[in-house]
From Swiss-Prot:
Residues 250-288, 344-395 form the Myb-like domain. Residues 317-341, 424-447, 476-499 bind DNA. It comes from Mus musculus (Mouse). The modification Phosphoserine is found at residues 68, 1252, 1254, 1301, 1309. It comes from the Eukaryota. This is snRNA-activating protein complex subunit 4.
Amino acid sequence: MDIDAEREKITQEIQELERILYPGSTSVHFEVSESSLSSDSEADSLPDEDLETAGAPILEEEGSSESSNDEEDPKDKALPEDPETCLQLNMVYQEVIREKLAEVSQLLAQNQEQQEEILFDLSGTKCPKVKDGRSLPSYMYIGHFLKPYFKDKVTGVGPPANEETREKATQGIKAFEQLLVTKWKHWEKALLRKSVVSDRLQRLLQPKLLKLEYLHEKQSRVSSELERQALEKQIKEAEKEIQDINQLPEEALLGNRLDSHDWEKISNINFEGARSAEEIRKFWQSSEHPSISKQEWSTEEVERLKAIAATHGHLEWHLVAEELGTSRSAFQCLQKFQQYNKTLKRKEWTEEEDHMLTQLVQEMRVGNHIPYRKIVYFMEGRDSMQLIYRWTKSLDPSLKRGFWAPEEDAKLLQAVAKYGAQDWFKIREEVPGRSDAQCRDRYIRRLHFSLKKGRWNAKEEQQLIQLIEKYGVGHWARIASELPHRSGSQCLSKWKILARKKQHLQRKRGQRPRHSSQWSSSGSSSSSSEDYGSSSGSDGSSGSENSDVELEASLEKSRALTPQQYRVPDIDLWVPTRLITSQSQREGTGCYPQHPAVSCCTQDASQNHHKEGSTTVSAAEKNQLQVPYETHSTVPRGDRFLHFSDTHSASLKDPACKSHTLMKERPKQPLLPSSRSGSDPGNNTAGPHLRQLWHGTYQNKQRRKRQALHRRLLKHRLLLAVIPWVGDINLACTQAPRRPATVQTKADSIRMQLECARLASTPVFTLLIQLLQIDTAGCMEVVRERKSQPPALLQPGTRNTQPHLLQASSNAKNNTGCLPSMTGEQTAKRASHKGRPRLGSCRTEATPFQVPVAAPRGLRPKPKTVSELLREKRLRESHAKKATQALGLNSQLLVSSPVILQPPLLPVPHGSPVVGPATSSVELSVPVAPVMVSSSPSGSWPVGGISATDKQPPNLQTISLNPPHKGTQVAAPAAFRSLALAPGQVPTGGHLSTLGQTSTTSQKQSLPKVLPILRAAPSLTQLSVQPPVSGQPLATKSSLPVNWVLTTQKLLSVQVPAVVGLPQSVMTPETIGLQAKQLPSPAKTPAFLEQPPASTDTEPKGPQGQEIPPTPGPEKAALDLSLLSQESEAAIVTWLKGCQGAFVPPLGSRMPYHPPSLCSLRALSSLLLQKQDLEQKASSLAASQAAGAQPDPKAGALQASLELVQRQFRDNPAYLLLKTRFLAIFSLPAFLATLPPNSIPTTLSPDVAVVSESDSEDLGDLELKDRARQLDCMACRVQASPAAPDPVQSHLVSPGQRAPSPGEVSAPSPLDASDGLDDLNVLRTRRARHSRR
């Protein structure tokens, strides 16, 4: 038979079968092609980059199928007619028949299912449809696989697998489509969860539905009524079970993690073939099941994972997950381990990888589309996200880098306004040449409307430092979230500037020569301006790119910016400057190198002192200047020698003083190490050797020198800044740095200018009278009334003082060897140090002309414990009560804050008897802090060395008053010299004599020179006359002043011992008094000498009756407002008016709040320490007055006393004025006491070297270094004076208490320690504030 005929016959048979099977359709191919359209869903699910590759084969396939259906290939008609061809055709037809038979069986199964559905719908039953899960509709599997590109024109079957495909299959190599891993989306996760619940529900309902269907069929066949009822009961039970299953919650239907589900059905039905069954199963069992923890891994959990994985050899991850016990799957454990494994960590891109990626992109890109998922197949160890990020952020040649142009910023702002601040992928297309990351960073970090640009203020810098300490360096986004109006890049840039500035400052300190360092206001201002320029420059240029290279370039550029000019704060004017030692050595020790006139004046005057009467610096004073100071004196050390010469008239004519008034600081050039290292500045022969030696030891001294300079800067800033408030004081020896006496500070020059300006006392009186609102007319009236009283009233007050004076003389005679006397040279040294203002008694000390006795050396005693302090306090209280009860009521005079001032006799040669008139003691009751006027007993200052005792720096806290003699030179501090004596006080016969002038008037006077001590209300001066005692030594005990205690009946006079510590000698049981010559006539001496500040217009008479010209009163002199402040006159006048000052409602006047000073702070602290005792005394007063019984300090007694005071003194103007003054003076100190600084301890600690934990690291190192220096300083002081108590005890001794003996004062007083620690804490507070700035 012809082959063509057979072929035609077979074709006809096939078409006939098709018509029989599908009478309503043209061909089977139509069904297949229609079902194949579902493949578009897969193409839709693919990513955009693969759409083109997936769409191209489909289009080609459709075109080929249409061409094959329309016309036949002409090559098919020319087949050879041989048996081989027939066999091949037979094989092809067999394959076609098999495929058609499979399709027919599927269609039959589908037809059968459709018939069942139709029958089920027609039956009308409400029971659920019973469906076999194994017989799924065939159309679900048709069309979900890509058809081959080429297929047979008749059968549509493609060619068999080629050799390459078969080889890959045998080797297990996956196809390219199988290598694609797409990320699971949120809707896919939700669909997976829903599919698992549906499959679980179907598995539970299937047996119940089959049972229900069986019961229905059986019920339809049963005829008896009983069987039908039993079946109905079973049907109801089955329906109830089905309802219970339908009501199960979703969590119960999810099942366990490893439960089996029909993953094939879920993959084909629910996911429509987009995900394979195996991929879905792995994702559900490894990540998505609810029992798997999806929280972030903690650090402890990761560490445990590493340890457990190491025990299992990094295998058996399911065992690792079980042992970990944190609901993690094995896949999660493996994935996290790979992330933290350094061997598997992704490394940086190499040049070869960049070159390969660039080449692949250029070859495989189609227009703007880049198939990253195909390119990653050729990049081993990289994923598609890495490729996208690397190409779009770094390798794309169209990207721009560097600064943004204004046009680009404008385009970026327009794009943000158009698309919003989120669609950066669209925004980048509006800004050509910039990536989405660049656009986002530029807008958020620079162009956002809420960002603040420009210089950082101090508050922002402080917040930045605190946030860096809180979160650490590197968390800039977190820091910027809490720092308003600043971005993370700004915070990073500012932190780099601060760190570089700190390192530069430390490096600058380390590289600076040892003696050429200069700390001045210009340095601080330049650093501040550099900070400003750096911050502004970095803010303008650092945000253009996220890389550190550009940021460093911008920081380097900001260094070259010119610092902008701005006003330097006033506090910077007080920054000390260091002096070049070699320059000071060439110009003379103790002089100022910038002004040689001063040096010449000082040296010449010291050499020709015996020839001229000018006020110059003696050799002893020069030696005093070279002694290392151990006290924090606010007097600048460079100008201490001028304290002896600033009250005389010659100083105004001296050209050196005139040059000091015009002194300006010049920048000092650092000298070579050779000129500084040598002992002799003029020795140039040893220059190279010294230079080499200096360079060899320079590196070893950097740290110590940096610490010393830093500490010295902070201390001088603090001490010099508080000079205008606290005046001229001595601070306790705590951490005094040692420096040469020739070092000059700017404060020295300012103080010299003030001292050369010879300020009179009248403006000071006028100032204080106006500040405290003193009634001058009333004071004058009281003065006149007191002067008119007879002198007989003095007798009752002197009866109690004579026995004490006799006892004092006897005790002093016995204890003469224990108290080494001081020469005039020592007195001059002590006068050069200002006494610390105290609210206590002022002590005078005798200065007989004896040879100084060196104090024994030894270790400092151990501080007392708390129990010892409490025991001493109880003893003092008991002694005070006994003394109060023993004393009688001898006078009704009210004396407050007694201070004993006694003049001594003229010194006589050692060993000669005391011949002269009988001595008498003068007792002056003055109310405020002591002053010191020291004079020399000899006519000239001795020139020569000083003893070992004199080399120890004195620490005087009190004032020694010596009578002036022939050749006497009076050295008074500038602060007290300005307060010259006013008429109406103790008759002195005129002002204090100046240096270089013989005070002939002072020789004729019998009373000592008493400096005025100001107070708000008039005080009384009581003179007690002592009969002559022969054989009495010159050093005697002082008379005890009368202190008055208010009781319910009258005033009690109590003897208060004046206890003052001597730093260089051992204390006697009571203080040493000074004796003066007897008054010429008791009748000529007034009984009571008034000493009010306002009584300056009276005309006092001298002891010989001569008239003294009166001084104009304060009301006649103009008020010098420059004494208060350097601000404008209008501001000072407004403050003096007290518009916002202290005000007590009954009074109509206001009083301005006074600035805090050391005096007010100490007074407030003393009041707070004695607060409990004062409350008890006030309570006892109120209780005794109310009930007349024993005082009962119980609850309510204090309130009763307050009500009593309010009721009795409600309209008393004196009480109201006192209350107003109290508020004016102590309001600001009390307010400061309520504001403890940050990180500074407010309690007193016995360890003076402990520093707060929040101090910076540099200050901590400085504290450790200074601790050793402090111990050395303390050891030196203990060796000089092992038993020298602090004079702070002078105003803290209870009434009636005896003075402590030398044995009792062996250990330092706790109050003294607390006082010194108070000063130390104040210093540390100010220093910590400066360091934070």
